[in-house]
């Protein structure tokens, strides 16, 4: 007896179309286009999770550099001074302090300068 793929196919199509919900045009309605669009979307999502980490680090460095230059020191000199002073704060925390707590950041810069 021949086995038909009715239930399995419907389940597979339903899963793909559910993942393609909200896509424009045939990409959200037609199975073949939805399958291609979701595969592409998943590839972009995988790539962009890594890109996002790079962009955030870049943003933190830009913020730290900007705040450091307002205090008369460059980013590289600040980071070297902090390392020599034994202040182990990562870039995410430093950027947050620079953005929200300028007086505390100034104290960190002074500590870095004195360690050099």
UniProtKB/Swiss-Prot annotation:
Keyword rRNA-binding: yes
Entry keyword set: Ribonucleoprotein, Ribosomal protein, RNA-binding, rRNA-binding
Keyword rRNA processing assigned: no
Alphabetized InterPro entries for the sequence: Ribosomal_bL20, RIBOSOMAL_L20_CS, Ribosomal_protein_bL20_C
GO biological process: ribosomal large subunit assembly; translation
PROSITE patterns registered for this protein in UniProt: RIBOSOMAL_L20
Pfam families for this protein: Ribosomal_L20
GO-annotated cellular components: cytosolic large ribosomal subunit
GO MF terms held by the record: rRNA binding; structural constituent of ribosome
Entry-linked PANTHER family: 39S RIBOSOMAL PROTEIN L20
Function statement: Binds directly to 23S ribosomal RNA and is necessary for the in vitro assembly process of the 50S ribosomal subunit. It is not involved in the protein synthesizing functions of that subunit.
Family: Belongs to the bacterial ribosomal protein bL20 family.
Name by which UniProt lists this protein: Large ribosomal subunit protein bL20
Designated gene of the protein: rplT
